[in-house]
């Protein structure tokens, strides 16, 4: 929630009248983002969850999970390099989603989306909670 996509996305979600609870998760800096967002007067209550030890608490009872996690593609980095790093991040997050919020709508922004979404689907299938109407890849062409 504290990266280049997660932070502005958190701001937009905080401002939405459809959001009552906004649970932010990251491996660094998330408490500062949550503190900044808490100063915005909306109905959404913001909580911060830092590191793998707080992931289950963050996801428990979630209706919607948005995953912008991972490294951005850097100059000289191949899509294979990007995949090797980001696939394991998505796999860990989806595994926790399957256990803690199996009925949540899951939106994956992590690149390469055409590879991370199928990985997520397979993990959800392994946990017997896969619903193709609840898993989305969110992307744009650049």
UniProtKB/Swiss-Prot annotation:
Primary subcellular site in the record, as a coarse category: mitochondrion
Lineage start: Eukaryota, Metazoa, Spiralia, Lophotrochozoa, Platyhelminthes
Disulfide linkage: none
Amino-acid positions noted as binding substrate in the UniProt annotation, renumbered to this chain: 73, 79, 111
Pfam families: Ldh_1_N (PF00056)
Keyword Cytoplasm: no
Keywords annotated in UniProt: Mitochondrion, NAD, Oxidoreductase, Tricarboxylic acid cycle
GO molecular function: L-malate dehydrogenase (NAD+) activity
InterPro entries: Lactate/malate_DH_N (IPR001236), NAD(P)-bd_dom_sf (IPR036291)
The keyword Hydrolase belongs to this UniProt entry's keyword annotation: no
Assembly notes: Homodimer.
A GO cellular component annotation in the UniProt record: mitochondrial matrix
Location of the protein in the cell: Mitochondrion matrix
Family: Belongs to the LDH/MDH superfamily. MDH type 1 family.
EC number: 1.1.1.37
The reaction(s) this protein catalyses: (S)-malate + NAD(+) = oxaloacetate + NADH + H(+)
Protein name: Malate dehydrogenase, mitochondrial
GO biological process: tricarboxylic acid cycle
Gene source species: Schistosoma mansoni
Binding site for NAD(+): 1-6, 26, 86, 109-111
């Amino acid at each position: 929630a504290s990266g280049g996509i997660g932070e502005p996305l958190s701001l937009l979600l905080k401002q939405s009248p459809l959001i009552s609870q906004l649970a932010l998760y990251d491996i660094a800096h998330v408490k500062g983002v949550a503190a900044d967002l808490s100063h915005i007067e909306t109905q959404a209550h913001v909580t911060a969850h830092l590191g793998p030890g707080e992931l289950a608490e963050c996801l428990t009872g979630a209706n919607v999970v948005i995953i912008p996690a991972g490294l951005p593609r850097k100059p000289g980095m191949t899509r294979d390099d990007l995949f090797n790093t980001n696939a394991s991040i998505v796999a860990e997050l989806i595994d926790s989603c399957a256990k803690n919020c199996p009925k949540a709508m899951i939106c994956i922004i992590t690149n390469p989306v055409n590879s991370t979404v199928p990985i997520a689907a397979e993990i959800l299938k392994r946990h017997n909670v896969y619903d193709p109407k609840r898993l989305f890849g969110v992307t744009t062409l650049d």
